[in-house]
Amino acid sequence: MNVLKEVYSTIEKRIQEKPEGSYVVKLTTDDKKTAVNKICEKIGEEAAEVIIAAKDDDKAEIIYESADLIFHTMVLLAKSGITYEELSEEFKKRMK
């Protein structure tokens, strides 16, 4: 299994099972509107950090902050009921 798919599956599982102490659960347990707002705020923060790292030409920081950005985007997608397969299909359409 590819690592991104594995992370996505873990996020989906945590949203569903709500294990105590999970960061994903902390982000997603409010009502949907509040949870989405909270997640979007994190995505905005992480996007800004990627931009700063890129402007500083700091490769390690770009990688680190991009992983945070991708993770929080995956949380948003999963909270919105979008599967990894649906996202993959969209990428496949764009490869033509």
UniProtKB/Swiss-Prot annotation:
It comes from the Archaea. The keyword Nucleotide-binding applies. Keywords: Amino-acid biosynthesis, ATP-binding, Cytoplasm, Histidine biosynthesis, Hydrolase, Nucleotide-binding. It is an enzyme of class 3 (hydrolase). One of its GO terms (molecular function) is phosphoribosyl-ATP diphosphatase activity. It catalyses: 1-(5-phospho-beta-D-ribosyl)-ATP + H2O = 1-(5-phospho-beta-D-ribosyl)-5'-AMP + diphosphate + H(+). The keyword Phosphoprotein does not apply. It is found in: Cytoplasm. One of its GO terms (biological process) is L-histidine biosynthetic process. Its EC number is 3.6.1.31. Transmembrane segments: none annotated. Signal peptide: none annotated. Its main location: cytoplasm. Coiled coil: none annotated. InterPro entries: HisE (IPR008179), PRib-ATP_PPHydrolase-like (IPR021130). Pathway: Amino-acid biosynthesis; L-histidine biosynthesis; L-histidine from 5-phospho-alpha-D-ribose 1-diphosphate: step 2/9. GO terms for cellular component: cytoplasm. Belongs to the PRA-PH family. This is Phosphoribosyl-ATP pyrophosphatase.
